[in-house]
């Protein structure tokens, strides 16, 4: 699986995720505005955080 990886204000890069079947994109509102995180897997999230998990290469754009 190939996913985009990104933390907050960084530019998204692609990464290979051995053994993973999902990519995710999650976002929430913070004191600096909307915060976006992308990566491998499909983590559980706290209330108030929106997450979208997907199952194809680079699907978390």
From Swiss-Prot:
GO cellular component: extracellular region
MF term (GO), any: toxin activity
Superkingdom to which the source organism belongs: Eukaryota
Keywords: Acetylcholine receptor inhibiting toxin, Disulfide bond, Ion channel impairing toxin, Neurotoxin, Postsynaptic neurotoxin, Secreted, Toxin
SUPFAM superfamilies: Snake toxin-like
PROSITE patterns: SNAKE_TOXIN
Tissues expressing the protein: Expressed by the venom gland.
Subcellular location: Secreted
Disulfide bonds listed in the record: 3-23, 17-40, 42-53, 54-59
Biological role stated in the UniProt entry: Binds to muscle nicotinic acetylcholine receptor (nAChR) and inhibit acetylcholine from binding to the receptor, thereby impairing neuromuscular transmission.
Stated family: Belongs to the three-finger toxin family. Short-chain subfamily. Type I alpha-neurotoxin sub-subfamily.
Protein name: Short neurotoxin 4
Organism (species): Naja annulifera (Banded Egyptian cobra)
